[in-house]
Every structure is written in C-alpha cells, then in structure tokens.
Amino acid sequence: MFNFEVISSCSNTEARTGIFHTPHGQVRTPRFMPVGTLATVKGISSQQLKSTGSEMILSNTFHLHLQPGEKLIKEAGGIHEFMNWDKPVLTDSGGYQVFSLAKLNNITNEGVEFKNPRDGSPVFLSPDKVMRIQMDLGSDIAMAFDHCPPHTATENDIQDSLNRTHLWLENCVETHKKSNQALFGIVQGGRYPKLREISAKFTSSFGLPGIAVGGVSVGESVEQIHNVINFVPKFLPKDKPRYLMGIGSLKEITLAIAKGFDLFDCVLPTRLGRHGTAFFNDERWNIRNARFKNDFSPIDKTCKCETCKSYSRAYLHHLVRNDEILGLTLISLHNIAHLLRFTNAISAAIKDNCFTIDFAPWKRSSIAHHTW
C-alpha cells in the first residue's frame, strides 16, 4: 500500500526523483507540501489548491485535536472527507508545539502537558494518544511524536530531548497498527553532528515507510541549517522518502534536494501571501508597493497559475492596499504554485542530468532554462 520508487538519479549530486504511493494517490518527489494546519490552507479552497499542482498537504494533529476534535473528523469520514481533499494528507504529530509553546507546557518521558492556547485548560499528549488521534484523523502519513528542543539548548538538554524522542518513537511504533496509514519517524539532535548521527541510525532501524529530519529552521543560523542538510542524509536509507521539515526557501530546498531529500513543507508561501508578498524567480515582491499601481502585467508572465493567467499586478496591488481577502488568496495561490513549479523544474533537470547546486532555471544562461 505504501511504496517508494526511485525513478531517476543525478550524476552530479545525491538528488533523485521518485514516486511515493499512498491510498489516496501518488506523490511525485521532490515535492513541496503546502501547510493546512486546521485542515485548510488559509484562505484557499481544496479546488483552488489542486489547481496549483499540490499533491499532498500537511495538517496539524495538536490543533485539530483542540478544534474541532478528532472524533468529529472521524465521524465525518476522516480528514479527506471533512475537507473535501481526495489526495494524500500528512499530519504532524504536535512535536513542533512542544517547541513553539514551550512556555505553556511541562515535559516528561510520559508526554507533554500543555495549557490550551485557546482557553488555558490543560491538555495532555502522550505518544500513544498522538497515534490514536492521527489514526482517527485518517491521514495517509502520521508523524511520530517527538521532542523538538530550542536551538539555544545545551548539548546535555538536547541529549535528554533525543533520548525522549527515541523513547516516544518506540511507543508510537508499538501503538500504531493502522495498515492504511504510514508512520514516519523523526530525526532530532540539534546542531550536534554526533547526536544527529545517533538519531538517524536509531530512527532508520525501525524500517518505517519514511523518515523525517526535524529540529531545523527553529531559529538557528543558516550555516547550522546547512550543516544538518549536508550531514544527516548519509545515515538515512536510500529506499525510503526523506522529509526535511519546515523548509521553504528556494536556496535551502535546492541544497536539500542535492543532498537527497524528497519532501518539504513550510508556511512561508501562504504567510507571505497573506501579507501581500509574491514570489518572482528567487525574489520576493511586496505587491503593496506603489510601483505596481499601474502595472498591468501578471506577477510572472511565464507562470501558468490561475492568478497569473487571470489577474494583473495592478489589480492585486489594488486588492491588498484595500485589505481585500481575495488579493491575499490570489497571491498565496501564486506562491504555492511557484514553489511547486520550482520543484517540478528540479525534477525535470534531474531526469535530464542537468541539475546543479546553483540551480536557477529562470536565468537564460542556465543549462536547465528549458525546465522553467
């Protein structure tokens, strides 16, 4: 039911293209996943999302548990029926909230007690409970519960969090018995190569359908992010999809693909879109700026997304300057389509054996320009 095929490999780098088979269809890799925390990519319908070429989205177990609750979603027929999305869904475990809500939680080896950010009521999550929530949600991929420490943590604290993550993975594997849902483990270890190596080898030992690398892009320097991207893949199995969590910039995605990563997610395209910022090649344009007021060209004349096919920069400028929701939706749609177009171009370049670490297909001088 879950199978990963490597289709082509790059002779210049560790990059590869592949297909991950799930009960709700195929995911072609390398692939960016839009983030739909509450079973919605903010401001975008499922039909609009399909128009961008999205093949899998990410939702969040912690937030869906709080509202509307996994039992209601199960009653609706699972997350796919609930949100009218017939393609694959990955649910994050809530491990990131262990990091982001650190001031509101208490962590032990048994689990994490949170204060509900909505009303302050106590919420307890354990590995067993997180697995049961995700089984009720009915996602295609369930992430193991992990402890994501802050990037400023000491080596001893990161070692403790790593031990806890490994203990929780064992508990998750023991609980997770759903054959039509894949369980992915998560590699932690902070900025310490030895801890990352230990975690990668431990997580790989379970033979799970896929492996993620977490604790990246949580406030550390770009150099530290690159160190993890460069170092960890050598300890991961080559026959499983590799998911680098929380990465959405073109530079980091390019490096990660070159090192053999396959899946990525980030809130960046929609968060920036909601603030009126659009992607163009490797630039970010604030559409609110006056220079777009009388510009009747699309954001990108080479882009085939619904926004670029139908609307001008001037119209989008008008919408965002007047805080019209449609403007933020249209820019978010373009940004998602742009990232997916970028990973599609990388896939084509890998197949044509012209992918390099400085991949920039929008440049006419690029050997991979034909992929753009």
From Swiss-Prot:
Q: How does it assemble?
A: Homodimer. Within each dimer, one monomer is responsible for RNA recognition and catalysis, while the other monomer binds to the replacement base PreQ1.
Spell out the disulfide connections: none
Where does this protein act, in terms of pathway? tRNA modification; tRNA-queuosine biosynthesis
Q: Which gene encodes it?
A: tgt
Q: Which residues bind substrate?
A: D92, S93, G94, G95, Y96, D146, Q188, G215
Q: Name one GO cellular component term.
A: cytosol
Residue ranges for the region (RNA binding) are 246-252, 270-274
Can you say what this protein is called?
Queuine tRNA-ribosyltransferase
Under which EC number(s) is this enzyme classified?
2.4.2.29
The catalytic activity, as recorded, is: 7-aminomethyl-7-carbaguanine + guanosine(34) in tRNA = 7-aminomethyl-7-carbaguanosine(34) in tRNA + guanine
Q: Which UniProt keywords apply?
A: Glycosyltransferase, Metal-binding, Queuosine biosynthesis, Transferase, tRNA processing, Zinc
Which cofactors are reported in the record for this sequence?
Answer: Zn(2+)
A molecular function GO annotation: metal ion binding
For the biological process aspect of GO, one term held by this record is:
queuosine biosynthetic process
The source organism is Prochlorococcus marinus (strain MIT 9515)
Q: A Pfam family matched by this chain, by name?
A: TGT
How the cofactor is bound: the record states: Binds 1 zinc ion per subunit.
Instruction: Tell whether Cytoplasm is among the UniProt keywords.
Output: no
**Residues at the active site:** D92 (proton acceptor), D265 (nucleophile)
